[in-house]
Each structure stands twice: as structure tokens, then as C-alpha cells.
Amino acid sequence: MSSSAIQVAKTATYLPDLVEVQRASFKWFLDEGLIEELDSFSPITDYTGKLELHFVGNEYRLKRPRHDVEEAKRRDATFASQMYVTCRLVNKETGEIKEQEVFIGELPLMTERGTFIINGAERVIVNQIVRSPGVYFKDEQDKNGRRTYNASVIPNRGAWLKFETDKNDLLHVRVDKTRKINAHVLMRAMGLSDNDVIDKLRHPEYYKKSIEAANEEGISSEDQALLELYKKLRPGEPPSVSGGQQLLQTRFFDPKRYDLGRVGRYKINKKLRLTIPDTVRTLTHEDVLSTLDYLINLELDVGGASLDDIDHLGNRRVRSVGELLQNQVRVGLNRLERIIKERMTVGETDSLTPAQLVNPKPLVAAVKEFFGSSQLSQFMDQTNPLAELTHKRRISALGPGGLTRERAGFAVRDIHPSHYGRLCPIETPEGPNAGLINSLATHARVNQYGFIETPFWKVENGRLIKEGDPIYLSADLEDECRVAPGDVATDADGQILAELIPVRYRQDFEKVPPEQVDYVQLSPVQVISVATSLIPFLEHDDANRALMGSNMQRQAVPLLRPERPLVGTGLETQVARDSGMVPISRVNGMVTFVDATAIIVRDEDGVDHTHYLQKYQRSNQDTCLNQRPIVCQGDAVIVGQVLADGSACEGGEIALGQNVLVAYMPWEGYNYEDAILVSERLVKDDLYTSVHIEKYEIEARQTKLGPEEITREIPNVAEESLGNLDEMGIIRIGAFVESGDILVGKVTPKGESDQPPEEKLLRAIFGEKARDVRDNSLRVPSTERGRVVDVRIYTREQGDELPPGANMVARVYVAQRRKIQVGDKMAGRHGNKGIISRILPREDMPFLPDGTPVDIVLNPLGVPSRMNVGQVFECLMGWAAANLDCRVKVVPFDEMYGAEKSQQTVEAYLKEAAKQPGKEWVYNPDNPGKLQLIDGRSGEPFDQPVTVGYAQILKLVHLVDDKIHARSTGPYSLVTQQPLGGKAQQGGQRLGEMEVWALEAYGAAYTLQELLTVKSDDMQGRNEALNAIVKGKPIPRPGTPESFKVLMRELQSLGLDIAVYTDEGKEVDLMQDVNPRRSTPSRPTYESLGVADYDED
């Protein structure tokens, strides 16, 4: 296959850096966020005012991290740096100043790839989308159907303030959802006179009713207003004027307690047309009066006042890593401040130093808690490079300060017109999180206020101006402009050709002449996310299936020999490169050395730059991370050139699947209901073989009876089983292991109680005994096998940090090659997924006129009802490309080149392919895109021509090997005594309500009885049954299921008198000790149950 790819459509396909949203935010935190927090807490004074502690925020410094990234992963450590800050302790009485550099905690650092290493695991901090602080005007209908209006002032932190109108034209205010207070009471309490308020309002006549109402309640002075305010906000406490004054001051005018944030101030200024500087982060009298004025204008419907849409992206902002971390640091500093104040009061004033006052623990704990257990700090999805990249660009509405799944309604989840070019309308999970977790669109970026912006080209007098950088607009700015889509047709000069252009204006569509267009979108791809933009012919797919296609590409397992798609979209290179999976040259220069582990590039000044490659490392999802060089010694390279392929990459492009020959036809029912029929070639040629690396870990702990030991001497184990263990009892690297094999031998001391009487007798006679130990080795779990690729041992002597109580930890990595097999899940890029139902020999597969057998047979009925026709276009375009020996890049949304363009392009390529010598059969004009296939079993041609072509098919991470599971005996749940569920718990198969109905319908009474008793939760019965099976005796009669006893107990605990009786009215005690039954001979199950049996028992 030639490496040159033909670009079918010419548009801007180069994207901005895709991980910028993470990196820029963390950089902001280091440059500004941290300093801002330290400064806001400085100075801390003690209760007497004698001592002051100043943090010199802009003089903080970070030490070099103790371990580099690789070392941190290996040692299970955190990749973090120590923070030091200069502190000044000022004694006001003596004027003495002590200055010292103090350690204030560890700060995890971001790696180049935008991730964090926490305890050896790579984690990502997901961006959160929350309601922006500011002022919001809403309308509500009361129960009589009358509209009332309200205004909420929402700060970044602090109390909410809500103004409301009611049916009597009075204005009220609520603080933090407490009881209503007359709005004028608040004005008076703030020290505003009636005239102050009236002068500021454009329609004061509406407000006068509220003044009269306040006077009628007898609140005419500031003091009375403050008392009233205190009564309403703190009911049940004795009110006082000073209390009211302090309450008002701390709630709204104290920067420590109330903060609008830079964003809140910007939004309020913009909405109310104020000019308050953005350093004033608390409420001002002007804010409150302007809000009232705007609310009255809304009520009277004058002055251009408008309601707010809270789902508009102009009213929602993104909090990225930097800001989330800053909030967490604030929490830590708050705790620290309390500690410092206490220490100032307790300690000797003269001998105190800053180092004695500052305790790093609270800050360390806050940061650790955020990275370790916050909802937004997630274990990185590393299945393949695309999964990793998407995870870093994810935007979640959940998390602290956000929404919860249960409370989120339809409006929040829905696609909003302002999402255009900012959030992807397609990529979101299926299920309860749909619409709450989104993905950033390809060209979107987050501005300094946290609003998402998207780029446009300017249009002047109908001419597109593409000089310089594009202009980025946020959602509220864009609403005021007329924006044309990115696929408008222009001439070479940039003049727009059509007479009327569809534009978006104020969230609506209209058609205008080119002269009225303000901006044009940068590229047709800018609407969708990275994963979605990898789907070719996306415009021909139904949105639901495109959603599945986007999500399933993230689950594709990296294959042994990746192959880039025949039909791509032109973004594959950038996705591979920005995911951080491929090493990139840092300089212009020449490759001087290449081997499997490193590449050395010598720059123009003769300096060597070494790039180390990852070899067979385990990813978070147990897939294999491996890099292979693609440059040779002596090659010239430029900055930013890809030097090696990572997992699921080929030639620097992302390659998630394989291009295989697909036919759409039914085959003996083997592809019924989305099942897939595949050829043996995929197994034999290792097309879909992937490497998975599993980690097994064991620790030797200190027990009460002495330490556990990792050793080769394991009791009651044959010498053959120890063949692959070294003298320490640890498996050698390169050994092939199967389920049940010992990986690490470990023995645990046995207590006296564990010993049978004969052991005790022997010990009494001979004194020292055969070692009292129990085999506790690490073995390969059932259904697993593979080759040991790495063994790591951690001990205290080597300086490794171990969990408490552990003396030594051993880790074994086992790699396995998994070929494709029946039960594995495969999918295309268009949401067409299925399970492999049969693997046919090559000779039985349908074959083409030139004798080539097809690789995969899909069901044609999967296309029409699902409306993902893109797969057919891809398949035919791939067929043409394979026959022309080239690769094609198709940019989505190609109607700008004319109607039905996809169809024409594909047909043109097919005709071109058929012109090749000996390839006339490739295109049949009577049945375009279809070929006559021949049945491999009979050699007869099929009745109808069949659609055949090359499509990229992925193997997904849902592998049957990880799911298959069986149980003979195993653990039971404590309360119900029923078997546990799931593979991890060695669980059973649930026999649910409907399965019971099915057996009842058949009348299979004995089968049903066994399933509900001895095979499940009849404790005594199942022990007896096992005993009977082992001894070859008939199985005894089942007893009472434990769950029935639990039900009885529950009903009794409700106070109901409920019991079980024989048909003679004699009560049966279900809870009595069940031992007497043991003495009776075990009866066959089929014996009829007589009354006499009870008397025997």
C-alpha cells in the first residue's frame, strides 16, 4: 500500500493542540492561581493583633521532584514537587521581623501529556462545567397562572441573594433561600435612604409600594431594618443592631466570605451595564440597585430587559485543573489559618518562628484528597491513544458544586444552539450520564474567564478574509453576529458564491445575502469532537449510531500489527501525535542512533537528544504500550516529526483496527441479529491478535504469629510445580504459566488452633515439629495463562514505600496474546457492532470473481433501520482505494462541493479503479457498488449481486476471555446465604423471577425446587447434597431456604405474628438447630412428603 494519501476535500484540517485545555490551566495555576491564594490569606493576625504572619506569595518555589515520571510509576510514588514559600513574622509591639522559607506541602505536577501520576497510577482531572457566577433573571408562574419575575445574584462562593416580585407588585428579597424580606428593608439596612434608591431607578413608581409596605410594618430607620433582618436570618436568637450590622457585613461585603470572582464581576458588569473595576469582588450598593432596576423593567416590560437562559453556554463556564486545584488549596489554607492562629495564642511570643507556626499537614491532606478521591480525578482511560486524548478533553457537569444524575432534567442534558462549535452534539455516553458528560469540539478553546470559544473567519462585504489568525468568539458574542457554516462555497478570491446564505443569528436560522454575513466557520469539522471527526462520511449516519461509533472507537484494543485506515478523515496524524503516545523530535537534526529502546537525534549544534521508547508496558486497562521506531539512522528530522509509532499507531497515524474485505449478505443465519461471520484468515494471520498484560501482586505481611515468608519451600507441593521458581520462590522471567501455577511462593505461620490433634500429639512427643506453615502462594487465576514478562520486588531495605504491615511486595506481570475468537465483540466506525458467531475456514467463505475470499460477512439488515449508511460509503470507497493502491482522506460534510457529492466521489473512484488493467470486474455499471459473489462451499454463484468492499473494523475491549466464567462451589452472601454474583466474586448465575416463571410453565417442579434450595441458599441441604454426591448416595430432601427465613424474620421484626405450620396446625420452628436431621437416613428427593416425617424429625 503506498504511503501517500489522496486528500479528497481541501479544508483546514490542522487543529490546535488538543491537550492545551489541561496544560494551559495548570500553567495558570503555577503562575497565578497559587500566588493569588497565598496572597489572599496574608496577613494572618492573632486574636490580640500583636503578631502578623505574611506569606510572600510571589516568592514561592518548587523543588525538583524526587522521582521522574517513569521512576514514580515504577515505585508507586506520586510525581510531585515540594512547595516552599517565604514567610515573615512581624511582632507589632517590638517591630521585630523574622523571615524564613517554610515548607508548605507537596504539589503533584502535570506530566507533558497532561496527566498526573498519583501513587504510581496515571490520572486525569476532568474539566467541570458549572453555572457561571453572575446575575440571572427568570420568570415563574404562580398557582393562579400569573407571571412573576425574580433575579438571583450567584457568587463564586458565599450567600445567594434573590429578589422576587409578587402579585401585589411588592418586591421581596431572600438570602440563601430563607424567608422573604421586604426589599426596602434590605436597602435601609444597607444604609440607603429612600431617595438614594429612587434616584437610581428608571421607574421608581413601581418601587414606592414596597417603601409603603416597609413603613406600615414600622420599619422606618436603619436600626429597625437591621433588627428585622437579624430576626429573619437568625430566628430564635435575641436580635441586636450590631448583630444585624455584622451579619450583613460578613454575608455580602467581606471578601473572605463573599466572592463573585473575576468571572462574576465581569458577568454582572456586562448584564447590568456597570463599570465597577474587576478587583472589587464583593457586592456593592450599585450592584443591588441596578439589579432592582432591571427587575422592575422586566416586570413592566420596558427598557430592553431580557430573561436569561441558564443552559446557554454564555451562562455556563468550564472549571479546569488549575481552578479546581486552586479551590482545594483554599480549603487547605483555611484549615492552616486556624492552626496558625491557635499556635500564635499558645506559643511564647518572643521565641516563635514562622517554621513553628506553619504546619504543612492540612494543605498536603487537602491536595491529596482532591487527587486521590475527588469525583473529577479519574483513573485515565488508556485503552488506546484516542481514549486517552478524549478523556483529557472531557467536560463533566457532575462533581462537587455541579449537578447530580438524579436531579438533572432534560433541559440540562439537551443540545443547545450555543453548543455549536464548542461542545460536541454527538459524543456523550449512553445511559444515565447522557448529556451530562460532553466532549470539547475540535477547534474549541477555553478563555481566561472559563467560557468556551470557537474560531471564525471574518467576512467583509461578502468576501472571506483568511489572513492572520482566526477570530475566537464566546457564545454570547456569537449570538450578536450572523455566522455562516464552514462549508459555504467561495471562489478563489474568497468571494461567497451563493445569493442567499443560511446563517445563525440569535440562536435561530435565517437566510441573508453574503454582504450581511459577519463570520464564517473555520472548518466543517469544528462542530464535532475529536473521536467523532475520525468517522468518514459522518454526514450519512444517524446521530444515535454516530454516538455509538464515537464511543466504540475509544474501546478499540491496540492490535499486534496496526494498520491505518484506507478511508480516513485527515485527522488521524494529529490525534496520534497529541495523545502523547508517539515520541516527537524536539529539534531539527539528524538521527545518529536507533534501536528498540532509544532514538538519538543530533541537533545542528552537535548536541545529542535521546528519546527513550516504551517497551511492552502495561496500561491502566491491561492493554500493551509499546513503541516502534519509524526513522532510520542517518535520516534528517525536523522539529515535531514523529520518530516512533505507539500502540494503535502506524506511520504516525492512529490505527485502531484493520482494513478487511467485507461482504453484506446473510449467511446461513450466522449473522442474524448483528452477529458476525469471520474468516479463519483473521486468526491465522494474526490480524486481530492483541497483547494484554496482567498484573499480579502479593505482599508478605507481619502477622501475630510471626512474619509471612516468600520462599520456595512450600508444604505439600510437588517439586515439578516449583520448576520455574528461583531460589527465593519467585517465578523466572520468560516462563510460560497456566491457571493454577505458582507465581510467588508464600507461607504463613499457622497458629496452634489450626492443628489437628495428631499434630499436637507428635509435637508433644518430638518437641520441634515439621514447620507450622500454611501455603498462601500467589497463583495464576482460572481462565488465565501467558508468559511472565516482568517481576518487581519491593522491600523496605531498598527504600521503597510499602503499605503498613508489609515487609515485602512482589509483582509479576504476565503477558498473553489473544487471538480473535467466537464471542469477541467487533465494530465498525459507524456504530455497527456485533459479536463473532462463527469462524469459517477460508475455503468456505464466499469469494470474489478473482478468487479472493472475503474476510467478514455482515448482515445487510443492519443498515436500513439503523440509518448508518456511512458504512456503505466507507466500504465502497475502501474498495476503490484498495484497487487503486492508495489511501483516501474524506473530510466530513462535503456538500459544499455540490449536492450528492459523496455518492459522485465514490462512484468516480470506483470507475477509476475499474480502468486498471485486468480490473474491469471491480465496477459493474448495471449494479454500481455490487459484485457477483461465489459460494465457497458449492462453487455456485449467489442469486443476487452483493455489496463488497474494504472497511475498517475494530476489535473492542469486551473480550470473551475476560467474561467467561463458571462456578462449582464458591462463596455465599452473608445475609441471604445465596451465591455471590459476578466473575470477580466467583459468583453464580442469577436465576431471576422470569426464569422461575419459565420453569413453572414447563412444570419442572423438581428442577425448580433444587435451583431454589440446594443449589442456592438452603444451608444444611447444600452441605448434605455435596456430601451425598461425594459418597455416591441419593441426594436428601431439600430444607428451608435461608432467604425465606430472612423474610420471616423481617416480617416478625415489623411486629407481625407470622409463623409456619404443618397441616395439623402444629408450628414449625424454622430457626431451631438443624442437627437432628443428620441422624435420619438421607432420603431420595422423589419420596412423597408425609405428615409422619415431621414426627420423625
From Swiss-Prot:
The protein, known as: DNA-directed RNA polymerase subunit beta
Keywords, sorted A to Z: DNA-directed RNA polymerase, Nucleotidyltransferase, Transcription, Transferase
Annotated CDD domains: RNA_pol_B_RPB2
HAMAP family: RNApol_bact_RpoB
Lineage: Bacteria, Bacillati, Cyanobacteriota, Cyanophyceae, Synechococcales
Tree of life domain: Bacteria
One record GO biological process: DNA-templated transcription
Organism annotation: Prochlorococcus marinus (strain MIT 9313)
Molecular-function annotations in GO: DNA binding; DNA-directed RNA polymerase activity; ribonucleoside binding
Gene3D superfamilies reported for this sequence: 2.40.50.100, 2.40.50.150, 3.90.1100.10, DNA-directed RNA polymerase, beta subunit, external 1 domain, DNA-directed RNA polymerase, subunit 2, domain 6, RNA polymerase alpha subunit dimerisation domain, RNA polymerase Rpb2, domain 2
Keyword flag Transferase: yes
NCBIfam families the record matches: PRK00405.1 (NF001616), rpoB (TIGR02013)
Gene: rpoB
GO CC annotations, alphabetized: DNA-directed RNA polymerase complex
Pfam families noted in UniProt: RNA_pol_Rpb2_1 (PF04563), RNA_pol_Rpb2_2 (PF04561), RNA_pol_Rpb2_3 (PF04565), RNA_pol_Rpb2_45 (PF10385), RNA_pol_Rpb2_6 (PF00562), RNA_pol_Rpb2_7 (PF04560)
Chain's role: DNA-dependent RNA polymerase catalyzes the transcription of DNA into RNA using the four ribonucleoside triphosphates as substrates.
EC number: 2.7.7.6
Reaction equations catalysed: RNA(n) + a ribonucleoside 5'-triphosphate = RNA(n+1) + diphosphate
